[in-house]
Amino acid sequence: MKKNYNPKDIEEHLYNFWEKNGFFKPNNNLNKPAFCIMMPPPNITGNLHMGHAFQQTIMDILIRYNRMQGKNTLWQVGTDHAGIATQILIERQIFSEERKTKKDYSRNDFIKKIWKWKKKSNFSVKKQMKRLGNSVDWDREKFTLDPDISNSVKEAFIILYKNNLIYQKKRLVHWDSKLETVISDLEVEHRLIKSKKWFIRYPIIKNIKNINIEYLLVATTRPETLLGDTALAINPKDDKYNHLIGQSVICPIVNRIIPIIADHYADMNKDTGCVKITPGHDFNDYEVGQRHKLPMINIFTFNGKIKSNFSIYDYQGSKSNFYDSSIPTEFQNLDILSARKKIIYEIEKLGLLEKIEECNFFTPYSERSGVIIQPMLTNQWYLKTSHLSQSAIDVVREKKIKFIPNQYKSMYLSWMNNIEDWCISRQLWWGHQIPVWYDDKKNIYVGHSEKKIREEYNISDDMILNQDNDVLDTWFSSGLWTFSTLGWPEKTEFLKIFHSTDVLVSGFDIIFFWIARMIMLTMYLVKDSYGNPQIPFKDVYITGLIRDEEGKKMSKSKGNVIDPIDMIDGISLNELIEKRTSNLLQPHLSQKIRYHTIKQFPNGISATGTDALRFTFSALASNTRDIQWDMNRLKGYRNFCNKLWNASRFVLKNTKDHDYFNFSVNDNMLLINKWILIKFNNTVKSYRNSLDSYRFDIAANILYDFIWNVFCDWYLEFVKSVIKSGSYQDIYFTKNVLIHVLELLLRLSHPIMPFITEAIWQRVKIIKHIKDRTIMLQSFPEYNDQLFDKSTLSNINWIKKIIIFIRNTRSKMNISSTKLLSLFLKNINSEKKKVIQENKFILKNIASLEKISILSKQDDEPCLSLKEIIDGVDILVPVLKAIDKEIELKRLNKEIEKIKSKMLISEKKMSNQDFLSYAPKNIIDKEIKKLKSLNEIYLTLSQQLESLHDAFCKKNKIFN
């Protein structure tokens, strides 16, 4: 092994070794227990970010852990076409490079550009995954637009359609006028903005005599939608207005006569108590319109301008001539804000604008394009999720699918109990084109292809069929991911072996987008051999969101994004600044980002290697919703990897010529060897329990504690003493245990730190005569419930306490570690005497002792000894001969004066009534603790000084 640990020397070489030899591949052995994880397919829109790296590390830990338990493992890898996100990206790209828009290309030519991007992006993402150590079967890599996946998507659509679960309907949707597509409710961001509220008069048509008011006053924040009003609503309990129910008003500008209706949606205590109803452009109004069977008017074009003619529909969405469809010429083709100004101008001219008020209200914005969302009446395809939800609710309630942490179960159930039908169509070019064809009479035909439809329905070639232009929502194909990747609808061996999968690792932000829909679609479409619905996965492990060191969300615009590969390989400051400030959507932020980057990383980012990054992810994987990234912990775990490397070098150096033999734990072995085997066994138990319960943070801490604090800090120090002073038999057997424990420890650590453990294991296996080719196919250490001895643990713990006491004595009395001391023990029982006798040479070596003596109860204690009672035994370390009395007296007096000075300041503060009355409680508590600590130090120093003054011993005292 090289002297210095350099991840670059081992990582790429080892990954190629694993991949080339097919160690990641599953097999078709039905008799072997299977374990399968479906990787949530990252989008092809760019490189992997911290969230991807974090979740993929967790998944790889689980895959490697289960593979080492002898399971037939499949980690299915793939990427998502990400319809809307990818199309936006390519549209921006061609505008930036060519000053062209999507509409300057044919659909096929535009899609060719995306496929070209996909090839480049996929290569980059794949390279990143390999750098992270992902043990995926690359031969089974999938893309959501692969032909076999597309076939699965079509088959799913056809089955759902033929079972009346997919339907087409004109309904109100969230419309993105920039992208000209419907977007999901979950892609709408509500922002609080400053705006105005306009109070508009609607003249009343007086059909009866007892109407004594001229108009109804309505408050609106969207006066442009007045063009689409089809009613005014008042609350039936409102005494001011209920006599007007059934009457009519004139809608200003368009002079449309609309009814006054009674509906509880109108809030008597809000604004005027009367509301305008625009079913074609407001979701609440749409519901009111459905209750009262009101006509619906569409006033906007798909790109957000006023139409040339109104589109008028009845409440069921059928074309209607209920109202005049003409729009005044001066409003036609105006954008929304211009139309708003024009409407207000005209209403004011008509004397129908009563007042304007400033207000703040929430406005829906598209998370995709950033424009204000317009509720729009459009014809879309829907999936009846309300018909699929109950079984998906039941499996979670019955714990057939478990959410970890459990709090996300409530979130899931809450949403599922209020689920609405899912709009599955999108007005995009990139994606799965809906497998629906229309003839010239608008008859609908659903099938895999035009050819198959003609065959199935006996349609001649003379009849023209046109395929629906829309594509399916990306989440529809993603919802089939657990089984489409395994060959469904064909009954493949892989589907039989690996479905249902074992665990889904995902974020809380896509529980509704993806997880819920996967459960519903899988349970409806996939059945076991008995015809029972299959679940997509047994467990759902929800990770927290990785935030920066200040707790802020990582984003390009904030300039706080860190590429995981930059932490693995390192990056210079200039390269990091360039990376963070290039291609910003808001270039004016570049100076701020530059300043922040220089402040945070004045020397760039140092290379840490993959294992340190993976260990950091594991250590931070708590059950919290937000996870704050910590560069200092990353550096600390880089040092941890270095510690393991150096410890392994020591072991290999001292065992290179050792002839290893198998052994069992017995009472004849040295206490330290029995102790390390028991400690390791206990570590295995708690470590496995942590991984089995998805507590990766606890598992990482357990591993860290054993490697650093138990194996390196104590066991290796014990071993050095044995090698230096032990008998031939003790040395030989200790080397055997040493290499054995290291090999087991490497196996235990492998799932979290695959590269460094493989690199070291390849050398360890030679000494242990292991013929296998890789650590990743070794058996994972198992807990042995027979291997436990409380006395061994307590005896070594006692020895450790003695050593720590001696080291503290040296520190207190300023005694060099090269100066030999003596150790006296008093009030010691026979068991402890035996422990001392058998481990005397270890104690002497580690604690730098000249001699160890046992005193009887009658013996006087050595003068000027530091004493501590440890586990009932008096431990005494004489220091008279080890110190220079005059120098030590001077040092102690100086220290005492310093402490007295600090105590005086603290006491003065604590006697100040103003401080006690006005200082915050935490500051006062801190001062109390400080004074207590100073008193304790003063007492200790005073006792040491007194002991020094009493340095001349009485006649019967034992001298050092």
From Swiss-Prot:
One GO process term, biological-process aspect: valyl-tRNA aminoacylation
Residues bound to ATP: 556
Renumbered ranges of motif 'HIGH' region: 42-52
Compartments (UniProt record): Cytoplasm
Gene3D superfamilies cross-referenced by the UniProt entry: HUPs, Isoleucyl-tRNA Synthetase, Domain 1, Valyl-tRNA synthetase, C-terminal domain, Valyl/Leucyl/Isoleucyl-tRNA synthetase, editing domain
Enzyme class name: ligase
Coiled-coil region list: 879-950
Primary subcellular site in the record, as a coarse category: cytoplasm
Statement: the UniProt record of this protein carries the keyword Isomerase: no
Superkingdom of source: Bacteria
UniProt catalytic activity: tRNA(Val) + L-valine + ATP = L-valyl-tRNA(Val) + AMP + diphosphate
CDD domains: Anticodon_Ia_Val, ValRS_core
Recorded GO CC terms: cytosol
Keyword Cytoplasm listed: yes
This protein's UniProt keywords: Aminoacyl-tRNA synthetase, ATP-binding, Coiled coil, Cytoplasm, Ligase, Nucleotide-binding, Protein biosynthesis
Note on domains (UniProt): ValRS has two distinct active sites: one for aminoacylation and one for editing. The misactivated threonine is translocated from the active site to the editing site. The C-terminal coiled-coil domain is crucial for aminoacylation activity.
HAMAP family referenced in this protein's UniProt entry, alphabetically: Val_tRNA_synth_type1
Family, as annotated: Belongs to the class-I aminoacyl-tRNA synthetase family. ValS type 1 subfamily.
NCBIfam families associated with the record: PRK05729.1 (NF004349), valS (TIGR00422)
Purpose of the protein: Catalyzes the attachment of valine to tRNA(Val). As ValRS can inadvertently accommodate and process structurally similar amino acids such as threonine, to avoid such errors, it has a 'posttransfer' editing activity that hydrolyzes mischarged Thr-tRNA(Val) in a tRNA-dependent manner.
Protein name as annotated: Valine--tRNA ligase
Gene assigned in the entry: valS
